[in-house]
């Protein structure tokens, strides 16, 4: 068995790998497609996404980040990472509720935006609904396969199984997309903590958003 180390980013969260790339990709896209506009990036977070998104977009011209997190249920360290991070374009907002309530607020903002935004303003997300979050995550599945083969730990024609600690399914979805693209991935094991939200959903077909 091998462990893929994804904690070497600036906030020590695995999401740093995608959220260091995403701001630069979005800055290039804005420059080419909508120069002179301002982008507001919303993030619903249970802790890690917020600080990683804020760190990635920190002081990036033309971008403002609003990270919404549950006022109860995240660790003091996670909250401190967001609320003490220096940056002229960053704001962390506590929501009275859980992660799903924070996410519902972000989704509602996108729904309202369909009615129109002020001129020169764009709205985007730092969550996994943004394909720009998932694409960089696909890369480290490819990297893992290559590293195993370079070490001789995986025969050239063999598949690799991945066990992925899973909260909101984004990371394991990147693995599924990598497999769909032809990467020799065998089983994708959805590892859940004692909250069991996804584990219960996969076993029963019922999703309990109250947790």
Task: Locate the predicted segments by residue.
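PLP-dependent amino-acid enzyme catalytic core
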Residues: 1-211
